[in-house]
A protein has these predicted regions:
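Glycine-rich phosphate-binding/hydrolytic loop that grips phosphoryl groups
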Residues: 1-2, 116-138
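Glycine-rich phosphate-binding loop plus the immediately following alpha-helix
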Residues: 1-25
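Long, low-complexity N-terminal extensions
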Residues: 11, 72, 90-91, 129
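Conserved, helical-rich catalytic subdomain that frames metal- and/or nucleotide-binding sites
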Residues: 18-38
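Adenine-nucleotide phosphate-binding core of ATP-dependent small-molecule kinases
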Residues: 38-88, 123
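Acidic-glycine-rich active-site phosphate/pyrophosphate-binding loop
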Residues: 43-53, 99-112
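Catalytic cores of soluble, metal-dependent hydrolases
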Residues: 66, 72, 91-95, 106-112, ...
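Glycine-rich phosphate-binding loops at beta-strand->alpha-helix junctions
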Residues: 79-108, 122-123
Length: 138
C-alpha cells in the first residue's frame, strides 16, 4: 500500500477503499466463463489484480489490496484445515476492522463450506491473549 497508495495507514486505506470497485481490478470467474461453475459462483476471484491496468483508480487499488490480504488469510486458514475436521475460524487483530471483512469472508464461507467468526473487540484479542499467557506463567 505504501508504494501504490503512498500510505500505510490502514484507516486511510479502508476509507479510500470504500468507494472502490473490486471488479475493476480483480479478474472474476464471470469474466472468463459465462456461467457459474460447480460450487464456484461467477463473482469468485479468478485472479487477484488480474484486470488492473493504468486506468484503475486509487479507490479500486485500495479495495484490491484489502481483498488480496483478506482472501489470502482466509485461503490459508481453509488450506491449513483441509485434511482435518476444523471448519470454524476465529479472526482477530486490526484487520478485522476493515469493512471489507463483511464482504470477503461471507463469500469464502459459501465457497468453502466453513465459518469465519469475528468476535467483539477482535482488534484487542491478540493483546488479551498475550496478557493471559503472561499471567499464566507468572
Amino acid at each position: 500500500s505504501r508504494l501504490l497508495l503512498k500510505t500505510h495507514d490502514f484507516r486511510q486505506i479502508a476509507a479510500i477503499a470504500e468507494k472502490g470497485d473490486i471488479t475493476r481490478v480483480n479478474l472474476q470467474i464471470g469474466d472468463i466463463c459465462n456461467r457459474p461453475l460447480p460450487d464456484l459462483p461467477v463473482h469468485a476471484t479468478a485472479s487477484l489484480f488480474g484486470k488492473a491496468d493504468s486506468n484503475a483508480s486509487q479507490e479500486d487499488i485500495a479495495k484490491g489490496i484489502i481483498y488480496m490480504v483478506l482472501q489470502t488469510i482466509g485461503g490459508a486458514a481453509v488450506l491449513s484445515a483441509l485434511n482435518g475436521p476444523i471448519r470454524d475460524f476465529v479472526l482477530i487483530g486490526n484487520l478485522t476492522k476493515f469493512p471489507q471483512c463483511h464482504e470477503v469472508f461471507p463469500n469464502m464461507e459459501k465457497i468453502y463450506g466453513v465459518r469465519f467468526h469475528i468476535p467483539p473487540y477482535a482488534e484487542y484479542r491478540t493483546a488479551i491473549g498475550a496478557a493471559l499467557a503472561y499471567l499464566s506463567k507468572h
